[in-house]
Design a protein with these regions (language model features):
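Catalytic cores of glycan-processing enzymes that make or break glycosidic bonds
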Residues: 1-170
Length: 170
């Protein structure tokens, strides 16, 4: 018999991944303690900071149709509202994952679960998360490179974001 301890993720002993109480998934979390980034610091990587585009869920017609198919009309009527052109935003009554979770609490069928998970993904479709103590400072959202909002960036912006992301997380 051996007396041994295996320590995985040593950073976990010093920094904790904090998930906001309004979130179900961890994508909108941030390390605590952490050094959030200022707008100037973000821009120093060559990424022009656009607060609304980068910190509010990016939702457009194409995305809704891709994610929800024939249920896109239901999602538009229930969870999002039209802003302009083909852009939507979350309705205030469903603007957090916990609010969406409450809506689906008694709906356990496969279709409802698919829609619920899709709406969760809409809410987390941001490039940056405001710091919980300093809202004018930001954390790059974890694992955003496979989301729709990242796809909206041009190649220079993607490169700048990835350099910033790698510096921040690694």
């Amino acid at each position: 018999y051996f007396t041994a301890y295996r320590i995985d993720h040593i950073l976990g002993f010093f920094r904790i991944w904090e998930i906001p109480s309004h979130s179900v998934h961890g994508l909108l979390g941030q390390f605590v303690p952490a050094l959030p980034m200022s707008v100037d610091e973000i821009q120093s990587y060559g990424l022009p900071f656009q607060k609304d585009f980068m910190t509010k869920p990016f939702i457009n017609e194409e995305m809704l149709n891709k994610m929800f198919g024939d249920k896109a009309a239901f999602v538009k009527e229930t969870f999002v509202q039209h802003v302009h052109d083909d852009i939507y935003e979350m309705r205030p009554e469903y603007d957090t994952q916990r609010k969406v979770e409450a809506y689906f609490s008694d709906k356990k069928d496969e279709e409802s679960i698919h829609i619920r998970e899709g709406v969760y993904a809409l809410i987390s479709n941001v490039l940056f998360v405001p710091d919980r103590k300093h809202p004018s400072m930001y954390h790059p959202r974890i694992a955003v490179q496979n989301d729709f909002i990242f796809g909206r960036l041009d190649w220079k912006e993607k490169d700048a974001f990835n350099r910033l992301y790698n510096h921040y997380y690694y």
